[in-house]
């Protein structure tokens, strides 16, 4: 009898473990976007006075400039973000480097090429050439001295693209266009990938790293080198199989060009060229691809098995300015485009996301708060009136943001934005790959979710006033038309 019962008991135990594991997977899947592995601030923070920021320092390189925001300000230190704005001139090359935090780059202007180098990935871009008969005869004798150009995949970017750069991944950038590249870089220092102290560190593979280190008062202002500069010439030449002279060149001891250098005759790169139609098709396909990946993850669970998308094939850039990709659109108010880990899978690695908002003349956003992220708002066009309120009901910011200014909005703080007469566009870079907001008005808002009696008793108003409060903006989502235009539209609807 015991031998008969054992398989039954064993089967029951296995079934229990299977069900328990499936339940745990479902629970983790449903709560993953609410949770974050991001570290909090090690200091006590008081977000009682927010301010608009502009760069406080500009450092000139040979072929561009790097503009730094005030990293010593409490808002940057408490939210754990580091922000720079770079201008790369035509034929300018941002030297290869990596940092200790994950970074999102938004391209405000221009176009160019970038090349993140993922460890362990093959050099899939290879140069093909024909050999002469003499070369073929000598091939066996000089095989070790014959090389061809090969490198990892390079990525073209343009205005409106968001480029994701994981922590510790070396990358470079080159401007092959006719106009300067202007881009805003936001690095999340409190990202779980950073196991160093909570401050930004750039590790340059070339040039002299004299720029970023000077932002910290307790860092030496001289003798800053690239990572090769700390090795002895003998060990470096032996490790890389090069001469001592070349090893000294790698250390760039007398290189005063800065982090953006000029390539006089342009870069010669192995790259495929796509037609305009192919580029447009790629935008649509990338959107569909992200949605398909999300649906597959919903079916398979939140645990990654490493086969869905590897380092070597993942996309590192996605356009967020294309009107055809808008998630919310109001022809009288504007549009909103979300870029999260569901659409752009690499964001799950960098643990950040982006939102692009275009508001028309005098349009406004529904009051909202960020549920699971801090938000770095950068104005790209126009002006906007912005108010932010903290947990005590205190107005911690009430002012106008204009083009080129930046505002950090802490998690859970309630914000309202209204475009001025010329309209407004901004990019919001957030510290969660699946950032969520809670709206206070319109469709899917907190008021619409509350019963009439709860609203009436909470604010000591009548039921009729409560219903009006819930449904006044009931046909709009996210972006609202100006009050005069909205009333006119309501009057037309009623008369019709």
Swiss-Prot record:
Residues in the signal sequence: 1-24
TM ranges: none
Keywords recorded for this protein, A-Z: Disulfide bond, Seed storage protein, Signal, Storage protein
Pfam families per the UniProt record, alphabetical: Cupin_1 (PF00190)
SS bonds (residue pairs): 45-78, 121-312
Domain Cupin type-1: 50-248, 318-467
Any single GO BP term: seed development
InterPro entries: 11S_seedstore_CS (IPR022379), 11S_seedstore_pln (IPR006044), Cupin_1 (IPR006045), RmlC-like_jellyroll (IPR014710), RmlC_Cupin_sf (IPR011051), Seed_Storage-Functional (IPR050253)
GO molecular function: nutrient reservoir activity
UniProt xrefs under PANTHER family: 12S SEED STORAGE PROTEIN CRB, OS03G0336100 PROTEIN-RELATED
Subunit structure and binding partners: Hexamer; each subunit is composed of an acidic and a basic chain derived from a single precursor and linked by a disulfide bond.
Entry's family note: Belongs to the 11S seed storage protein (globulins) family.
Protein function: Seed storage protein.
Protein name in UniProt: Glutelin type-A 3
């Amino acid at each position: 009898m015991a031998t008969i019962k054992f398989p039954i008991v064993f089967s029951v135990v296995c079934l229990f473990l299977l069900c328990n594991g499936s339940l745990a997977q479902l629970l983790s899947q449903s709560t993953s976007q609410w949770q974050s592995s991001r570290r909090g601030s090690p200091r006590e923070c008081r977000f009682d006075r927010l301010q608009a920021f502009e760069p406080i320092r500009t450092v000139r390189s040979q072929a561009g400039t790097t503009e730094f925001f005030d990293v010593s300000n409490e808002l940057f230190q408490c939210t754990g973000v580091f922000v720079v704005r770079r201008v790369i001139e035509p034929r300018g090359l941002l030297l290869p480097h990596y940092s200790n935090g994950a970074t999102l780059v938004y391209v405000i202007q221009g176009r160019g090429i970038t090349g993140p180098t993922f460890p362990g990935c093959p050099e899939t871009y290879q140069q093909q050439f024909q050999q002469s008969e003499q070369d073929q005869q000598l091939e066996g004798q000089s095989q070790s001295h014959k090389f061809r150009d090969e490198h990892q995949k390079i990525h073209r970017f343009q205005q409106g693209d968001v480029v994701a750069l994981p922590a510790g991944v070396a990358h470079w950038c080159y401007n092959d266009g006719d106009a300067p590249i202007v881009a805003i870089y936001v690095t999340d220092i409190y990202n779980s990938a950073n196991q160093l102290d909570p401050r930004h560190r750039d590790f340059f593979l070339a040039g002299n790293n004299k720029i970023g280190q000077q932002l910290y008062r307790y860092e030496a202002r001289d003798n800053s080198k690239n990572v090769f500069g700390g090795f002895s010439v003998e060990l470096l030449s032996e490790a890389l199989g090069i001469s001592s002279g070349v090893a000294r060149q790698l250390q760039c001891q007398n290189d005063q060009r800065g982090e953006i250098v000029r390539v006089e005759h342009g870069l010669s790169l192995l790259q495929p060229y796509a037609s305009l139609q192919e580029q447009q098709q790629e935008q649509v396909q990338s959107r569909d691809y992200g949605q398909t990946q999300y649906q597959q993850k919903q079916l398979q669970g939140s645990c990654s098995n490493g086969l869905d998308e590897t380092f070597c094939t993942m996309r590192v850039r996605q356009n967020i300015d294309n009107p055809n990709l808008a998630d919310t659109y109001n022809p009288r108010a504007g549009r909103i485009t979300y870029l999260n880990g569901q659409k752009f899978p690499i964001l799950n690695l960098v643990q950040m996301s982006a939102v692009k908002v275009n508001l028309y003349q005098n349009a406004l956003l529904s009051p909202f708060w960020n549920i699971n992220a801090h938000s770095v708002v950068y104005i790209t066009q126009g002006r906007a009136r912005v108010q932010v309120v903290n947990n005590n009901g205190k107005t911690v910011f009430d002012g106008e943001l204009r083009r080129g200014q930046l505002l950090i909005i802490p998690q859970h703080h309630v914000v309202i934005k209204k475009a001025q007469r010329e309209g407004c566009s901004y990019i919001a870079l957030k510290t969660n790959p699946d950032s969520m907001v809670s709206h206070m008005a319109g469709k899917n808002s907190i008021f619409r979710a509350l019963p009439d009696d709860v609203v009436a008793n909470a604010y000591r108003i009548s039921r009729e006033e409560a219903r009006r409060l819930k449904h006044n903006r009931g046909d709009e989502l996210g972006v609202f038309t100006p009050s005069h235009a909205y009333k006119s539209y309501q009057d037309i609807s009623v008369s019709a």
